[in-house]
Amino acid sequence: KAIPTSFMEQGMRAQKTFCEDGAFLNSLKGVWLEKLSSSNTPQFERLAIFWLNHFSVNFNMYKQKHAFFQHLKFVRQNANKNYLGYLKGIIKDPAMITYLNNEKSYAQNPNENLAREFLELFSLGQGHYQENDIKNLARHISGNSINFVTEKFHKYNYKTSTENYSAFGKKYKNDKEFFEILRAHPSFGEFIAKKFYKEYVELDEPSKEDLAYLVTYFKNSNFEIPEMLRATLYLKKFWEKKLSLIKSPLELFYGTARTLNYSGLDNNHISLIDNMEESGQRLFNPPNIAGWPNGKEWLGGQKLEKSILNGECKLQWK
């Protein structure tokens, strides 16, 4: 069961939408990280961070406060629900639409950013689609835009192509038909199964047997996210005692704080946020649409070890 997102509304109400960008962002960081450090369901919080990185949006690129706030709610409200539902929602997410410039798309001149990233980074992964699939999807969603007054989703029919489209050799006319075709794609489910494996098990690619098990389990559950997680945790390799994962700065600092019962957090978590950002991870401002790096990429050019060895965290333990 997903945790209510009313706690984030506290930060939204406290800073309103007319406050300066830094105050707004720090408010949201504070309430998100407070939940991360004190939640009774830390596994949900890890899932939420996983999906926040999967559907990656950089606030500083466009600084639309209400749209970004709605994006965070969207991520949390669906983190423990259905993967297909997530995908259906992300092509109508105002923050993602703006981040990938789909509001500038027209039927006669479609912007392909959202369509390309949807297939490459959100659903299928490289090698499982053709350029023509991108072009058709871009035309299909060319009217998916944003009302810049309310910063909510708005579909402009005059910008939408009325032609028939095709995906993976099959024709479709609307969202429903497209997602039915996507769901039937022989590789659908593999991409996200690999990401779960690398998030929870090890950084290496899963074996053919483990991948087949994960995908089959996922498909049989109608792509329910809790079942994907359950299947991942059932894997024998998950329980092997070996150093197979590398923590991000966020995982390291907040995991340590929870484990050691850290009691020195101020209301806005400034000390840990500063250390995390000095180590290369700025919450809500990932480097690009692919999100934060994982694994060994965190080991190079970091201040992480220096921050810990020099005692910059100034932690006070119970």
Ranges and model annotations:
Residues 1, 193-221, 229-318:
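Flexible, low-complexity segments enriched for small/polar residues
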Residues 49-60, 92-96, 140-147, 172, ...:
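Glycine-rich, acidic and aromatic/proline-enriched surface loops and short helix-turn segments
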Residues 1, 55, 92-98, 104-105, ...:
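Cell-wall polysaccharide-cleaving catalytic domain and substrate-binding groove, primarily
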